[in-house]
């Protein structure tokens, strides 16, 4: 009787398929991907260890030198920025801060 895709019988059938049939394929895919990622991670770690063994002590000395040689200049994050709206606000504040002269009586 109900022929629309929103009919409860169609929705129930789709949910059964989703849980029973399609879920197996999804689980198998996730398992394959996770296994491959684990293997890649192990390969990367082994390559890193081999590189460190080849470089040996020289790598440790280079790291110490690079830390000592590069004291970075502190970047100030306070103050006015270069944006157009900041320039406008700054100019407006400068105008307001100047005292306006009043008319004096003679």
UniProtKB/Swiss-Prot annotation:
**What's the short name of a Pfam family annotated to this entry?**
YBL028C_N
Q: Which InterPro entries does the annotation name?
A: DUF2423
Q: Where is this region: Disordered?
A: 1-21, 52-106
Q: Which residues form a coiled coil?
A: none
Q: Where is the composition biased (Basic and acidic residues)?
A: 62-72
Q: Basic residues compositional bias: what residue ranges?
A: 83-106
Indicate, by first and last residue, each region the UniProt record lists as having compositional bias (Polar residues): 1-12
PANTHER family linked to this entry? UPF0642 PROTEIN YBL028C (PTHR28219:SF1)
Q: What else is known?
A: Present with 6210 molecules/cell in log phase SD medium.
Listed name of the protein = UPF0642 protein YBL028C
